[in-house]
Amino acid sequence: MEKKYYALAYYYITRVDNPHEEIALHKKFLEDLDVSCRIYISEQGINGQFSGYEPHAELYMQWLKERPNFSKIKFKIHHIKENIFPRITVKYRKELAALGCEVDLSKQAKHISPQEWHEKLQENRCLILDVRNNYEWKIGHFDNATLPDIQTFREFPEYAEKLAQECDPETTPVMMYCTGGIRCELYSPVLLEKGFKEVYQLDGGVIAYGQQVGTGKWLGKLFVFDDRLAIPIDESDPDVAPIAECCHCQTPSDAYYNCANTDCNALFLCCDECIHQHQGCCGEECSQSPRVRKFDSSRGNKPFRRAHLCEISENSESASCCLI
């Protein structure tokens, strides 16, 4: 019988007095299980992405909920065919999602459920703000969303200044969303500090919206920081038309690849025909590089992690590949 796996996305903001002890306990519990993960723990709480054989994933969820600090944690679950991370990674990270500035986490925008969010979208009254990176929203976003041309989460505090100048914070209601919710937890205090009076955040992020509402007002696919890279937000509606384009021929495509030029390795969008024609490279210059690795079509578009886009900078949140 074929083994079945879960993909889990979760975070919890809570005081953790000894995060390094928590990390050690996690590693000990997970070491003999058929799982892979990328988990960050700090004094702020936990931010995790996880995959595992279903019984082992169930064990982990039960174990974590039995811990005093994490009894109220919520898991968002997808069904998958195999583990989607290369290994078990549990690390300390001071900022669970690297915003690059101190925030008062006690000041939060109002959480609204996916159903409430869907209803508010139809009112067409609020500014819909996507607080993900540009390469994420390029393949999928809410209809009529404001899409900041930003490559790392650290750029968003500066964007809040710009937004406050472009619209009146006193009278502009804002609905903000991200993949799983944690970036909104950290960014909503910034918007409130800039004077925005009416700010809402999508509880559980786009993942929860897809699971509870369906495709709804969402266009395209959802970028995820694991081997899948792009997924439909509704598992029952997998045939989603691409909203992005191949960088070579401009035909519709939502497939990201790492450039086969080892010195480039950038993420780029490409159709199936062009990825073979250009041997996995993002452009003509890269295809002529002496350090082009052989394109292996059997890997599909699985990330090449040695110098993946999500590892460009140790000082950016994209180094973690654990934004949800």
From Swiss-Prot:
Major enzyme class: oxidoreductase
Record-level GO BP terms: tRNA modification
Family according to the record: Belongs to the TrhO family.
Naturally occurring in which organism (per UniProt): Chlamydia pneumoniae (Chlamydophila pneumoniae)
Keyword Transcription regulation: no
Keywords: Oxidoreductase, tRNA processing
NCBIfam families xrefs: PRK00142.1-2 (NF001134), PRK00142.1-3 (NF001135)
Cited PROSITE patterns: RHODANESE_3 (PS50206)
Top-level taxonomy: Bacteria, Pseudomonadati, Chlamydiota, Chlamydiia, Chlamydiales
Domain Rhodanese: 122-218
EC number, UniProt record: 1.14.-.-
InterPro entries: Rhodanese-like_dom, Rhodanese-like_dom_sf, Rhodanese_C, TrhO, TRHO_N
PANTHER family in the cross-refs: RHODANESE-LIKE DOMAIN-CONTAINING PROTEIN 7-RELATED, THIOSULFATE SULFURTRANSFERASE/RHODANESE-LIKE DOMAIN-CONTAINING PROTEIN 2
HAMAP family associated with the record: TrhO
Domain of life: Bacteria
Protein name: tRNA uridine(34) hydroxylase
Reaction it catalyzes: uridine(34) in tRNA + AH2 + O2 = 5-hydroxyuridine(34) in tRNA + A + H2O
